[in-house]
Amino acid sequence: MLMPKRVKHRKVMRGKMKGNAGRGTTVTFGTYALKALEPAWITSRQIEAARVAMNRFMKRDGKIWIRIFPDKPVTKKPAETRMGSGKGNPEFWVAVVKPGRIMFEAEGVSQEVATEAFRLAAKKLPIKTKFIVRPEHEG
């Protein structure tokens, strides 16, 4: 699963997911892409599940790029613990995804295969997504 090797701060504040994505909104590496239409925290497990679903369908054909990385630690206090006594320990990692962000890219397969692979990947994610074809490859 994806997580940073080392971080400057072990615990971070939750923050707000306002507005649309400022960067990572264009298809850069591949021909096809999966774009987020809603804001969400995508966990490293969800990213991995989507990656596995795409790889299983595409088999050995094509190449996949993961354009998001879970670099935000989410803390959690143990069950049945009284409130107070500090912030909990980091439990899992999330990627902050805003609307318009390209999450996955692929190339080297037909559009039908890519569409189905991204549809399977989208089922593993907790947000609405859209399949995109790079503008110069449409038609």
From Swiss-Prot:
Recorded hits in PROSITE patterns, A to Z, give: RIBOSOMAL_L16_1, RIBOSOMAL_L16_2
Q: Which UniProt keywords apply?
A: Ribonucleoprotein, Ribosomal protein, RNA-binding, rRNA-binding, tRNA-binding
Biological process according to GO: translation
Source domain of life is: Bacteria
Q: Which GO terms describe its cellular component?
A: cytosolic large ribosomal subunit
What InterPro entries does the annotation carry?
Ribosomal_uL16, Ribosomal_uL16_bact-type, Ribosomal_uL16_CS, Ribosomal_uL16_dom, Ribosomal_uL16_sf
One GO MF term: rRNA binding
Q: Which family does it belong to?
A: Belongs to the universal ribosomal protein uL16 family.
- Quaternary context: Part of the 50S ribosomal subunit.
- NCBIfam families according to UniProt: rplP_bact
HAMAP family according to UniProt? Ribosomal_uL16
Q: State its role.
A: Binds 23S rRNA and is also seen to make contacts with the A and possibly P site tRNAs.
What name does the UniProt record give this protein? Large ribosomal subunit protein uL16
Q: Please tell me the species this chain comes from.
A: Prosthecochloris aestuarii (strain DSM 271 / SK 413)
